[in-house]
Amino acid sequence: NNPLIFEIDLGFAVDLGVVTIERARVRLRFDPLGPPELTAFAAGIDIPGALRGRGYLEMNESEIKGQIDLTIVPVQVRIAAGVGVANINENGRKATGVIVSLEVEFPVAIPLGNSGLGIYGFLGLFAMHYSRKEPPPSAMAPALAWLKDIAQGNPTDIAAWSPKIDTWAFGVGAVLGTMGSSVIFNLKGVVMLELPGPRLLLMMRANLLAVLPKLKGTAEGTFLAVIDLDMGRGTLTIGLSVEFGIQPLLEIHIPVEAFFNFHDSKDWHLYLGRFIEQIHAKILEVFDGSGYLMLSGKGFAAGDLADGLPVPVNGFAISTGLHVSFVWGSKSVGLYAEVAAGVDAVLGFDPFRLTGVLYLRGTLHVFIIDLSAWAKLTVDIGEKPDGSKVASISGQICGRVKFLFFSIE
């Protein structure tokens, strides 16, 4: 009863003059045998001095959707629109899903008083029997993970939505930017209402570009932010992701998450980085540092903390960590020295327990010879969940000489 289908997705650039074909997806049915089917198509258009843009169309047995992005060259007005229609059958229930998105950008901003900012465009979205695609499990807040990984920073991208009965969404937003400034800053923000729930979301993506003549480089930053108020569940989630760099000097990544449950006063947390996704900075390919600070009203479970720290930790708890490393030389050549140090700790109050792990590691690599030494210190003071007391300090010091074919430790 299983059909035999062969599908090929081609990406190319066939220039036909005004029109450029960019993509085509063809499906062939062998059992039962059927004619070829075009299931996806993308093309661009460029009429000099008049119009340029691109669009795509996808279709299958139950859904057809596409987007188009055009710029009217004489007036420099950009218009982007997307439409999707789906026939949905879920557990015997049938419905027709519709999603529509629209975005308009102007060449000249509408000034916002004396703020130095202006409105460069507007955007909107309507979705009936459509919902946001579920992002894969990650360390980020779900709505922020969707905005970053699925929607690629654009909430009105209909490719980030999928058909689902009894879900609705309404969104309006604007595009803001600087006016007459050497620092280029633009922000795309959307206020979205989702049903059932109701659920109110504020999603923002901001880009920053500043030219630094003295450093002969540029400072670039991308900021993603989500405020998710789920009135049905009684929760508030705030997520922030910052990527900032000054090439070739500095790279910084900062994740932040806050969560509050209005039905349970102990169910809250504030994460300035997490052990599994830390605040990270790199300077000149020489210094590498990361760290985190986690506060939780309900403690921590397995997977939340560094290796060597006890879990679970109940009640209000704090966990923090800092890790740094320096590299001199070239790892690609095989001649370098590296020093690394770090500490991870957790403090719980129900019952009281303080545990910390400190390590120091050094390596000298000279082509085929590798000299390494490391030390580790663990401190554990307080009371275990079973009521037994603990007060211990333990350490370990090791060294190793590694040659091309053997090592001594």
Where are these regions (language model features)?
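Extended assembly/interaction regions that build large supramolecular complexes
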Residues: 1-409
